């Protein structure tokens, strides 16, 4: 073996160093004699190789060379041979266990394989225990056989005897075949090899032994070369080369401020004289154990063996060691006073380690890790004398060593107190060291008690729902360090709740806060701290425990849309979640909509696999917008109190700025009360003129109302689109201010034009009305032939058409900002229609040339026909129904009641309730035709001309002609007929009128029609004409009226009238027709 690096150093020095060396040599010799006496008493005469503790440790009365059974509690040994030989070869592959039953006879040894199998079952029991459920695998293995873990699994460790519990003997060190040392002697013992051990065990132990050898070889020892006698063999131990000071530390443990040295040594090793002819075998680990226990300076009686890699066993080449190394290995830190004399300590250690071999030994002796000579067999006669000399030298040596470093030794009770305090502080070393290096600079508070959690229910006061600081010197503290370091960089020792803005202190240990932290991809308030977590930019946010619990009415928040309360009582307090806790608990379909186009990203009943998936960015399949769509602003989703349930955003609504080329401008906008339905009468031209809607932000809704109006001013930010909305409002106000003078000028011009047009209309009406009246009264009795009636009617209608065309041109000039009016019927079509209405009963057989008025009159006269004699009342009753577009049966009109008709036009409604006006008073219904005509005329004069009303499409003329009307008549009337326009539609009350009023034409038409009383010619076509009464027009007449219908609504007429008493309207119609019949 190569000599140590310090073995060739010269021993020359001053006289003081030589004196210390001599004293240490004498002390070493006395210790060797003491150990030799102990082993000589316990070694049996048979010379069997066995461990020192096992010589007297026979179980069940079995001697040192006996056998015992494996004490596996289940009784089923994992090996074929259940017997364990009490020798070094067998015990090297065994584990020793202890039973708390003093009278246990099951045994104390298990096979290593059996013990590992049994230990795995105990670990499963520990894992199932509630208190250890949060431990890691490393923690369970570390604390299984300690007091902390064994208390949890004690019941699962029942002994085979049935009266006690087993536990692993942590103090027992199994012997190793490679640790056997042959002493220099006769050499008649056989060589121990590894062949008796299994290869698997060697592989398991290889790594541990290799590390142990590396640590031992790095240490500075005092041994020189190996001397080999002629016929003797000296197997070298793997644990050689360590100094005695490394494995037997001074019991005067050095603690900070105690004034004691730290293993600087009153013990050094050098060779000892002995009997070269004697032989024996000694195990190194056993020697180390008993040398510590039998040391007279070990007042506490503790096993002060150093662990591998510790400060004392890592080598003695340098006396200065970092405090972190000492603390991490469980050793006690070096005194600061001792660090003041580094040069003196190095000289002293070098002098203690350099031990030249004296000539009195006669040969070079091998030294093991304890610095003991391999020749330990000394004559028993010399042992007592050497023991007395050793005690005297040690008593004299203590003051000498104390004076070397100027330290004062402590009494035994003080040593015990210091060791106990050091053990108690070992748990806190890790946390204190981490706290000092986490960059927090001590700005966080230390929690004194847990009284703040008394507000929680008793069922939540446990370690599962409140994060508690773990005990032990283990890690797994990344979350705490992440939070504290992030807050320390921002110099924040307290945070604010995101909901109630209550300040919360941050503590340096779990629970870190009286609430919970979470990371959100959106900054909910200005108090959220921007952090980097796993390469993502997130915001550290906090919620207090009162808001999480939600038991207080002032802290509860509800969803704005479904009004479901948010409950965070299931979250763990005092720690941090790596996702947005509000987004992870969606309550309704509004949470799954895109932030841009408001379309559903997933089905409302569908849920993601993990809570953190809701905080990740996704791409909308409709608008291709990539965003964290499931994370919504808190002010947008939640409210403290909601009086009414707010409407949801429709899926078809466009964003605030509608993209070009889309049809989003024609969509409806929902208000606070609900979204209006689309009307069938609206046209594309009207929708194209409407400005683009703003569905994302409604200025009428106070988005700051739900969350802490007074407590949390920073959180009450406006809606995400509020700023954009405000900018648009400002721009609109500026444009309006600029356009106000122009609009005022235009309004004044329009008013002057309207006044002029009204005057012209009144003059034309006064000029035209006498002509018509004279024509009506003077010519009607004289005209008896049909041809003259047709010519007179043609002249009247031609004049009417000319006046109508002139007025239309004037209106187009005045109303240049409105849509062009629809084209009216041509003169040819109008004359054809009027000529068709004057035909005799022979022409009435043709349905293609019939009209609504002819059908009405024919239906009235058809009561005298032979085909209708079975139904004498059918003609008058259905004539009234045909006039008002509904049947007089029990089905009634859509807006009437019973069999009474109504004047309310249900199909022509455009939603403008303010345009309704009474056609006549309910109590003063017209009783004759003159009263009806006068009422129409007075109503027309009261109308403000040229009212700007949105343009309407032509629709059913009958007040009740709609697709929703129903009829129960047996004549085959179909609901589709009600969609046809007819001439009986009454114009609206607020619409724009033409100069020639409609009631004048109505009078001309009635006065110039000749009704034939010949019933014989109408019998063939009575049934066909009767079927057309209900629809007010036949199929061909409806198509003709579409092109030339002078009785439809004006271009800008209003669409709704107030409902009038049905009885008055029916009576007026009957009186009208009675007057008409009397005229003939």
Curated annotation (Swiss-Prot):
Major localization class: cytoplasm
Other information: Readthrough of the terminator UAA occurs between codons for Ala-650 and His-652. Readthrough is not always suppressed as the shorter protein is more abundant.
InterPro entries cross-referenced by the UniProt entry: Headcase (IPR026066), Headcase_mid (IPR031947), HECA_N (IPR054537)
Compositionally biased intervals (Low complexity): 263-277, 801-826, 941-974
Biased composition (Polar residues): 181-197, 232-251, 663-688, 900-913
Keywords per UniProt: Cytoplasm, Developmental protein
Disordered: region residues: 1-27, 181-277, 310-335, 655-693, 798-826, 891-916, 940-974
Compositional bias per record (Gly residues), positions renumbered to this chain: 218-228
Function field: Required for imaginal cell differentiation, may be involved in hormonal responsiveness during metamorphosis. Involved in an inhibitory signaling mechanism to determine the number of cells that will form unicellular sprouts in the trachea. Regulated by transcription factor esg. The longer hdc protein is completely functional and the shorter protein carries some function.
UniProt-listed PANTHER family: HEADCASE PROTEIN, HEADCASE PROTEIN HOMOLOG
GO CC terms: axon; cytoplasm; dendrite; perinuclear region of cytoplasm
Entry keyword annotation includes DNA repair: no
Name this protein carries in UniProt: Headcase protein
Tissue distribution of the protein: Expressed in all imaginal cells of the embryo and larvae. Expressed in a subset of tracheal fusion cells from stage 14 to the end of embryogenesis in metameres 2-9, lateral trunk and ventral anastomoses.
Subcellular location field: Cytoplasm
Gene Ontology terms describing biological process: autophagic cell death; instar larval or pupal development; negative regulation of neurogenesis; regulation of neuron remodeling; regulatory ncRNA-mediated post-transcriptional gene silencing; terminal branching, open tracheal system
Keyword Coiled coil: no
């Amino acid at each position: 073996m190569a000599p140590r690096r310090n073995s060739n150093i010269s021993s020359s020095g001053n006289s003081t160093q030589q004196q210390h060396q001599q004293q240490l040599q004498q002390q070493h010799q006395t210790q060797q004699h003491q150990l030799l006496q102990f082993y000589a008493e316990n070694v049996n005469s048979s010379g069997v190789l066995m461990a020192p503790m096992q010589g007297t440790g026979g179980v069940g009365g079995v001697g040192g060379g006996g056998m015992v059974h494996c004490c596996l509690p289940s009784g089923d040994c994992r090996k074929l041979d259940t017997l364990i030989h009490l020798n070094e070869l067998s015990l090297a592959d065994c584990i020793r266990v202890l039973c708390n039953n003093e009278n246990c006879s099951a045994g104390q040894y298990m096979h290593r394989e059996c013990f590992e199998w049994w230990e795995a079952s105990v670990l499963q029991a520990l894992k199932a225990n509630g208190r250890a459920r949060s431990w890691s695998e490393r923690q369970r293995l570390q604390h299984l056989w300690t007091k902390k873990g064994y208390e949890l699994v004690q019941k699962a460790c029942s002994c085979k005897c049935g009266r006690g519990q087993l536990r692993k003997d942590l103090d027992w060190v199994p012997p190793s075949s490679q640790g056997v040392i042959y002493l220099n002697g006769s050499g008649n013992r056989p060589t121990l090899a590894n062949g008796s051990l299994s290869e698997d065990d060697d592989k398991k132990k290889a790594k541990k032994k290799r590390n142990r050898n590396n640590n031992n070889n790095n240490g500075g020892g005092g041994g020189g070369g190996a001397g080999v006698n002629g016929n003797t063999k000296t197997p070298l131990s793997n644990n050689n080369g360590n100094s005695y000071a490394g494995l037997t530390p001074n019991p005067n443990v050095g603690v900070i401020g105690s004034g004691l040295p730290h293993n600087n040594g009153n013990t050094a090793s050098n060779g000892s004289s002995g009997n070269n002819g004697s032989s024996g075998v000694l195990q190194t680990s056993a020697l180390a154990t008993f040398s510590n226990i039998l040391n007279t300076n070990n007042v506490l009686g503790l096993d002060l063996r150093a662990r591998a890699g510790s400060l004392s066993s890592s080598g003695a080449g340098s006396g200065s060691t970092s405090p972190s190394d000492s603390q991490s290995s469980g050793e006690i830190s070096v005194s600061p006073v001792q660090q003041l004399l580094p040069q003196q300590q190095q000289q002293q250690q070098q002098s203690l380690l350099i031990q030249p071999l004296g000539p009195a030994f006669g040969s070079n002796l091998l030294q093991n890790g304890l610095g003991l000579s391999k020749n330990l067999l000394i004559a028993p006669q010399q042992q007592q004398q050497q023991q007395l000399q050793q005690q005297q030298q040690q008593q004299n040596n203590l003051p000498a060593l104390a004076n070397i470093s100027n330290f004062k030794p402590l009494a035994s009770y003080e040593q015990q107190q210091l060791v106990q305090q050091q053990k108690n502080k070992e748990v806190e070393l890790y946390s204190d060291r981490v706290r000092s290096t986490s960059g927090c600079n001590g700005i966080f508070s230390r929690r004194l008690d847990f009284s703040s959690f008394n507000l929680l229910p008793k069922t939540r006061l446990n370690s599962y729902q409140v994060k508690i600081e773990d005990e032990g010197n283990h890690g797994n503290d990344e979350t705490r360090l992440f939070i504290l370091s992030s807050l320390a960089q921002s110099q924040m020792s307290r945070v604010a709740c995101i909901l109630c803005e209550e300040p919360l202190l941050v503590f340096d240990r779990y629970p870190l806060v009286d609430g919970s932290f979470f990371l959100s991809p959106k900054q909910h308030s200005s108090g959220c701290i921007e952090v980097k977590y796993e390469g993502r930019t997130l915001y550290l946010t906090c919620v207090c425990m009162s808001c999480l619990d939600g038991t207080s009415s002032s802290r509860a928040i509800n969803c704005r849309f479904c009004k479901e309360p948010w409950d965070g009582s299931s979250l763990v307090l005092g720690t941090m979640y790596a996702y947005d806790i509000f987004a992870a608990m969606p309550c309704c379909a509004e949470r799954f909509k895109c932030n841009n186009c408001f379309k559903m990203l997933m089905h409302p009943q569908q849920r993601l696999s993990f809570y953190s998936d809701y905080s990740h960015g996704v791409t909308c399949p409709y608008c291709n917008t990539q965003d964290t769509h499931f994370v919504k602003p808190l002010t947008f989703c939640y409210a403290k109190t909601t009086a009414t349930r707010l409407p949801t955003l429709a899926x078809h609504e466009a964003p605030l700025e509608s993209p070009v080329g889309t049809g989003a401008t024609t969509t409806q906008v929902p208000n606070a009360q609900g979204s209006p339905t689309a009307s069938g009468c609206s046209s594309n031209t009207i929708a194209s003129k409407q400005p683009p809607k703003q569905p994302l932000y409604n200025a009428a809704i106070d988005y700051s109302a739900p969350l802490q109006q007074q407590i949390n001013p920073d959180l009450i930010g406006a809606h995400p689109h509020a700023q954009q909305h405000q900018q648009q409002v400002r721009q609109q106000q500026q444009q309006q201010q600029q356009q106000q003078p122009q609009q005022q000028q235009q309004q004044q011009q329009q008013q002057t034009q309207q006044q002029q047009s009204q005057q012209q209309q009144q003059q034309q009406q006064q000029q035209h009305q006498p002509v018509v009246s004279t024509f009506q009264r003077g010519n009607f009795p004289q005209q008896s032939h049909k041809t003259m009636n047709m010519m007179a009617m043609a002249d009247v209608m031609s004049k009417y058409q000319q006046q109508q065309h002139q007025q239309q041109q004037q209106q187009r000039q005045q109303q240049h900002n409105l849509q062009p009016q629809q084209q009216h019927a041509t003169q040819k079509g109008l004359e054809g229609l009027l000529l068709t209405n004057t035909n005799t009963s022979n022409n009435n057989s043709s349905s293609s040339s019939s009209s609504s008025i002819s059908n009405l009159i024919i239906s009235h006269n058809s009561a005298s026909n032979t085909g209708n004699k079975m139904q004498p009342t059918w003609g008058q009753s259905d004539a009234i129904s045909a006039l008002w577009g509904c049947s007089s049966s029990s089905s009634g009109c859509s807006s009437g009641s019973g069999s009474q008709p109504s004047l309310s036009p249900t199909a022509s409604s455009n939603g403008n309730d303010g345009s309704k006006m009474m056609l006549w008073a309910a109590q003063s219904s017209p009783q004759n035709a003159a009263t009806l005509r006068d009422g129409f005329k007075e109503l027309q004069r009261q109308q403000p001309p040229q009212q700007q009303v949105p343009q309407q499409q032509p629709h059913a003329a009958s007040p009740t002609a709609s697709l929703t009307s129903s009829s129960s008549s047996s004549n085959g009337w179909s609901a589709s007929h009600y969609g046809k326009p007819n001439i009986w539609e009454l114009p609206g009350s607020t619409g724009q009128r033409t100069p020639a009023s409609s009631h004048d034409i109505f009078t001309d038409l009635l006065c110039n029609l000749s009704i034939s009383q010949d019933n014989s010619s109408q019998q063939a076509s009575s049934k066909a004409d009767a079927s057309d009464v209900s629809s007010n027009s036949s199929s061909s007449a409806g198509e003709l009226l579409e092109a030339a219908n002078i009785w439809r609504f004006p271009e800008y007429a209003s669409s709704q009238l107030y409902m009038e008493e049905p009885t008055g309207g029916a009576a007026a119609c009957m009186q009208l027709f009675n007057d008409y019949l009397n005229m003939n």
